[in-house]
A protein has these predicted regions:
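Acidic, PIN/NYN-like endoribonuclease modules and their adjacent C-terminal/linker elements
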Residues: 2-8, 12, 33, 39-42, ...
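Short, charged N-terminal beta->alpha structural module
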Residues: 10-20, 24
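Structured helix-beta-strand junction loops
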Residues: 21, 48, 80-81
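Acidic, metal-binding active-site segment of PIN/NYN-like and related structure-specific nucleases
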Residues: 38, 44-46, 50-65
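Conserved BB-loop
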Residues: 24-36
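Short, mixed-charge, low-aromatic patches
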Residues: 1-2, 16-20, 53-59
Length: 127
Protein backbone atom coordinates (compact mmCIF):
# COMPACT_ATOMS: atom_id res chain seq x y z
CA UNK A 1 0.00 0.00 0.00
CA UNK A 2 1.57 3.31 -1.04
CA UNK A 3 2.06 6.09 1.47
CA UNK A 4 0.14 9.35 1.33
CA UNK A 5 1.33 12.95 0.88
CA UNK A 6 -1.18 15.58 2.00
CA UNK A 7 -1.10 19.02 0.42
CA UNK A 8 -1.03 22.16 2.59
CA UNK A 9 -4.76 22.69 2.13
CA UNK A 10 -5.69 19.34 3.72
CA UNK A 11 -6.25 19.59 7.48
CA UNK A 12 -3.71 17.97 9.79
CA UNK A 13 -6.58 16.18 11.50
CA UNK A 14 -7.07 14.21 8.26
CA UNK A 15 -3.43 13.12 8.50
CA UNK A 16 -3.98 12.00 12.09
CA UNK A 17 -7.11 10.01 11.18
CA UNK A 18 -5.36 8.31 8.26
CA UNK A 19 -2.33 7.48 10.42
CA UNK A 20 -4.66 5.95 13.02
CA UNK A 21 -6.18 3.88 10.20
CA UNK A 22 -2.74 2.43 9.44
CA UNK A 23 -1.56 4.60 6.56
CA UNK A 24 1.92 6.10 6.25
CA UNK A 25 1.17 9.82 5.95
CA UNK A 26 3.35 12.89 5.48
CA UNK A 27 2.16 16.47 5.23
CA UNK A 28 3.63 19.34 3.28
CA UNK A 29 4.38 21.06 6.59
CA UNK A 30 6.29 18.04 7.93
CA UNK A 31 8.44 18.08 4.80
CA UNK A 32 9.08 21.84 5.05
CA UNK A 33 7.11 22.40 1.85
CA UNK A 34 4.28 24.55 3.19
CA UNK A 35 5.20 27.38 0.78
CA UNK A 36 6.39 25.20 -2.09
CA UNK A 37 4.64 25.53 -5.46
CA UNK A 38 2.21 22.84 -6.53
CA UNK A 39 4.62 21.29 -9.02
CA UNK A 40 7.24 20.84 -6.29
CA UNK A 41 4.64 19.18 -4.04
CA UNK A 42 3.70 16.68 -6.74
CA UNK A 43 7.34 15.99 -7.57
CA UNK A 44 8.14 15.27 -3.91
CA UNK A 45 5.21 12.86 -3.64
CA UNK A 46 6.28 11.13 -6.87
CA UNK A 47 9.89 10.81 -5.74
CA UNK A 48 8.75 9.25 -2.46
CA UNK A 49 6.22 6.95 -4.15
CA UNK A 50 3.33 8.53 -2.25
CA UNK A 51 -0.21 9.20 -3.44
CA UNK A 52 -0.75 12.97 -3.50
CA UNK A 53 -3.96 14.32 -1.94
CA UNK A 54 -5.30 17.85 -2.36
CA UNK A 55 -8.42 20.01 -2.50
CA UNK A 56 -6.91 22.02 -5.36
CA UNK A 57 -8.57 20.26 -8.29
CA UNK A 58 -7.86 22.81 -11.01
CA UNK A 59 -4.12 23.08 -10.41
CA UNK A 60 -3.46 19.39 -9.97
CA UNK A 61 -5.62 18.32 -12.90
CA UNK A 62 -3.53 20.64 -15.09
CA UNK A 63 -0.28 19.36 -13.58
CA UNK A 64 -1.35 15.74 -14.06
CA UNK A 65 -2.19 16.38 -17.72
CA UNK A 66 1.10 18.22 -18.29
CA UNK A 67 3.01 15.43 -16.51
CA UNK A 68 1.66 12.88 -18.99
CA UNK A 69 1.94 15.05 -22.11
CA UNK A 70 5.48 16.19 -21.39
CA UNK A 71 6.65 12.71 -20.38
CA UNK A 72 5.29 11.28 -23.63
CA UNK A 73 6.89 14.07 -25.67
CA UNK A 74 10.26 13.63 -23.96
CA UNK A 75 10.15 9.83 -24.18
CA UNK A 76 10.37 9.27 -20.41
CA UNK A 77 8.17 7.29 -18.04
CA UNK A 78 5.39 9.31 -16.41
CA UNK A 79 5.57 7.74 -12.96
CA UNK A 80 3.71 8.98 -9.91
CA UNK A 81 1.80 7.00 -7.29
CA UNK A 82 -1.49 8.75 -8.01
CA UNK A 83 -3.38 11.96 -7.31
CA UNK A 84 -6.60 12.12 -5.28
CA UNK A 85 -8.65 15.31 -5.32
CA UNK A 86 -11.20 15.72 -2.56
CA UNK A 87 -13.75 18.42 -1.72
CA UNK A 88 -13.61 20.32 1.56
CA UNK A 89 -15.57 18.44 4.21
CA UNK A 90 -15.25 17.47 7.86
CA UNK A 91 -11.88 15.76 8.46
CA UNK A 92 -13.52 12.41 9.24
CA UNK A 93 -15.46 12.61 5.96
CA UNK A 94 -12.33 13.48 3.97
CA UNK A 95 -10.49 10.58 5.62
CA UNK A 96 -13.38 8.26 4.70
CA UNK A 97 -13.19 9.34 1.05
CA UNK A 98 -9.48 8.54 1.01
CA UNK A 99 -9.70 5.19 2.81
CA UNK A 100 -12.53 4.17 0.48
CA UNK A 101 -10.46 4.55 -2.68
CA UNK A 102 -7.29 3.21 -1.09
CA UNK A 103 -9.18 0.00 -0.21
CA UNK A 104 -10.96 -0.21 -3.57
CA UNK A 105 -8.23 -2.03 -5.45
CA UNK A 106 -8.47 0.50 -8.27
CA UNK A 107 -5.17 1.28 -10.00
CA UNK A 108 -3.77 4.52 -8.58
CA UNK A 109 -0.33 4.74 -10.18
CA UNK A 110 -0.17 7.52 -12.78
CA UNK A 111 -3.90 8.16 -12.37
CA UNK A 112 -5.94 11.08 -11.08
CA UNK A 113 -9.25 10.54 -9.30
CA UNK A 114 -11.65 13.20 -8.11
CA UNK A 115 -14.41 12.75 -5.54
CA UNK A 116 -17.75 13.97 -6.88
CA UNK A 117 -20.67 14.45 -4.45
CA UNK A 118 -23.03 12.89 -6.99
CA UNK A 119 -21.08 9.89 -8.11
CA UNK A 120 -18.17 9.27 -5.77
CA UNK A 121 -14.71 8.68 -7.20
CA UNK A 122 -14.30 9.50 -10.88
CA UNK A 123 -11.15 8.76 -12.87
CA UNK A 124 -9.80 11.67 -14.90
CA UNK A 125 -8.99 10.55 -18.45
CA UNK A 126 -5.31 10.49 -19.26
CA UNK A 127 -4.55 12.97 -22.06
Amino acid sequence: MPGLHLDNCVARQVARLLTEAGYSVVTAAELGLQRAPDGRQLLEAAQQGRVFISHNANHFTSLHDAWHLWSRSWGVAALHAGILLIPHALPRVEARYITEIMASGWPLANELYRWRPRGGWVRHPTP
